[in-house]
Design a protein with these regions (language model features):
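Intrinsically disordered, flexible peripheral segments
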Residues: 1-83
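Conserved, carboxylate-rich catalytic/transport cores that coordinate ions
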Residues: 49-398
Length: 398
C-alpha cells in the first residue's frame, strides 16, 4: 500500500534521475580546462538559426560546417516525418536506419505499407476496431515516442483496412448475413455491396497482388536509378535497372506478338543481352563465363521469387475472410443470438489478433526484403541530442 501511495513520487524521481544521468554522460564528453570549454557535435542543418540565437547570448566562438564525405559513416540520422509517415518510424527503426548519404524511406514506403496492410486485413469491422483503439489510446493515454508511433501506424492501418473491407464487402466476415438468417430475414439480407469478393475472385486477387508487386519493385528501382544518377553512376543505371526494364518490355511485346522481326523478339533479345553484359562487366577472364550463368540464374529466380512473394497479400486476405466466416457459421448453428455472439466474440478476437500481427509481419517482409533490397542503404545511427527525456511526466518551459 505504501508503494502505491508513493507511485507518483517514484515516477517523478525516476524522470529526474534519468535526466541527470543523461546530463552527466554529456558532460563527460566535453573538453576543457579551468577557463576554456570545447564542444563538438552534430545538429540538423535547419536548426542552425536556433543555435545561433543561443550562442549569441554568450561570449563564445562557434562555427558550423557540413560533414565531409569521409565523415558520413559517423554522421547521425534524423528522419523527417509528418502525420502520415511518423508511424513508419517503427518499421524503419526495427529494420535499420538509413545511412546519412542514403534516402529517407518513410515517405517512399508509407503508401505501399498502408495499402498492403489494408488489403491483407480487408474487413470494415476490424478496421473500425483498429481506428477506435488508436483514437482512444491517443486521447486517453497521451502516448509518446514509440507508443505514439505504434498508435499512429494502427490508425492508418485501420483506415486502410476499413476502405479495403468496403471494397470486398466484409464486416466481421459475413456476420450480418448470419444474423439475418437467425432473425428469419429474407435470403440475401445483410449482404453488402462489393467491388470484388476474395473467395469468388481469388484468381483476380492473385493477379492483382502480382501487379502491385511489380509496381512496388519497379518503384524501388526508379529510386535506385535516381540515386545512381546523382552519384554519377549512369552506366550502372543503364546496364542494371535499364537492362531489366528493356527485358520486361520485351516480354510484354513477345506475349502480345508485337515487334517481332522474322519471328525473333528483338526487344527481348536486346534486353537479355544487356542483362548478361551488365552482370559480367566487372568480371575478368574465365570469371566472365561463370558470371553469365550466375547472372541468368539470379535474374530469373530472383525476380520470379520476388514477384511470387506478393501472393501473400491474396493469401492473407483469403485466410482472414475464411476464418471469419467459419466462426460466424459455427455461431449460427444453434440459431440463437446469445450463442452466436458468444462464439462471435471469441472467434473474432482470435482472428483479429492473429491477423493484426500476421499482416504486420508479412507487410514488413515485403517492405524490408523486397522493396528495400532495390535501393535502400542502411547502417545509420540515430541522432540522440541532449534533452530532457522523461517517461512519466511532461516538462513545461517557463
Amino acid at each position: 500500500m505504501a508503494l502505491k501511495e508513493s507511485q507518483a513520487e517514484l515516477k517523478l524521481a525516476a524522470d529526474v534521475v534519468s535526466t541527470k544521468i543523461a546530463r552527466a554522460e554529456a558532460e563527460d564528453k566535453l573538453y576543457g580546462m579551468k577557463s576554456i570549454v570545447f564542444m563538438q557535435g552534430w545538429m540538423p542543418a535547419e536548426k542552425e538559426p536556433e543555435l545561433a540565437d543561443i550562442f549569441d547570448k554568450y561570449e563564445c566562438a562557434w562555427e558550423t560546417e557540413d560533414p565531409d564525405p569521409s565523415e558520413y559513416p559517423d554522421v547521425p540520422v534524423k528522419l523527417k516525418n509528418n502525420k502520415l509517415t511518423n508511424g513508419l518510424n517503427m518499421v524503419t527503426e526495427m529494420y535499420s536506419l538509413p545511412a546519412y548519404d542514403g534516402v529517407d524511406p518513410n515517405p517512399l514506403m508509407a503508401p505501399f505499407f498502408i495499402l498492403f496492410y489494408g488489403l491483407m486485413m480487408a474487413d470494415m469491422g476490424y478496421g473500425l476496431v483498429m481506428i477506435a483503439a488508436a483514437l482512444v489510446a491517443m486521447k486517453k493515454i497521451k502516448p509518446r515516442e514509440g507508443t505514439l508511433t505504434f498508435c499512429q501506424l494502427l490508425l492508418w492501418g485501420g483506415i486502410s483496412t476499413f476502405i479495403m473491407g468496403a471494397l470486398t464487402g466484409g464486416f466481421f466476415g459475413d456476420a450480418l448475413v448470419q444474423i439475418g438468417g437467425i432473425l428469419g430475414m429474407p435470403e440475401g439480407w445483410g449482404t453488402l455491396p462489393c467491388l470484388f469478393n476474395p473467395l469468388d475472385d481469388a484468381i483476380y486477387v492473385l493477379v492483382g497482388s502480382m501487379v502491385l508487386g511489380l509496381i512496388h519493385l519497379n518503384t524501388g528501382m526508379v529510386i535506385n536509378v535516381v540515386q545512381r544518377v546523382k552519384r554519377g553512376d549512369i552506366a550502372g543505371a543503364i546496364w542494371e535497372e535499364g537492362a531489366l526494364w528493356v527485358t520486361m518490355v520485351g516480354i510484354v511485346l513477345f506475349v502480345l506478338k508485337i515487334g517481332n522481326v522474322a519471328g525473333v523478339p528483338v526487344v527481348l533479345v536486346i534486353g537479355c543481352v544487356m542483362v548478361l553484359f551488365g552482370g559480367t562487366r566487372s568480371a575478368k577472364g574465365f570469371g566472365k563465363l561463370t558470371s553469365i550463368f550466375g547472372t541468368l540464374y539470379n535474374t530469373l529466380t530472383g525476380w520470379f521469387g520476388d514477384i511470387l512473394s506478393y501472393s501473400r497479400i491474396m493469401a492473407l486476405m483469403l485466410a482472414g475472410s475464411v476464418i471469419a466466416q467459419v466462426f460466424n457459421t459455427i455461431g449460427a448453428i444453434a440459431n440463437n443470438l446469445v450463442v452466436f455472439f458468444i462464439i462471435f466474440l471469441i472467434g473474432h478476437a482470435l482472428n483479429f489478433a492473429l491477423n493484426l500481427l500476421g499482416c504486420y509481419v508479412h507487410d514488413l517482409r515485403l517492405q524490408c526484403l523486397e522493396y528495400f533490397g532495390k535501393f535502400y542503404k542502411d547502417g545509420g545511427r540515430a541522432f540522440a541530442p541532449l534533452r530532457i527525456k522523461t517517461k512519466y511526466y511532461d516538462t513545461v518551459e517557463q
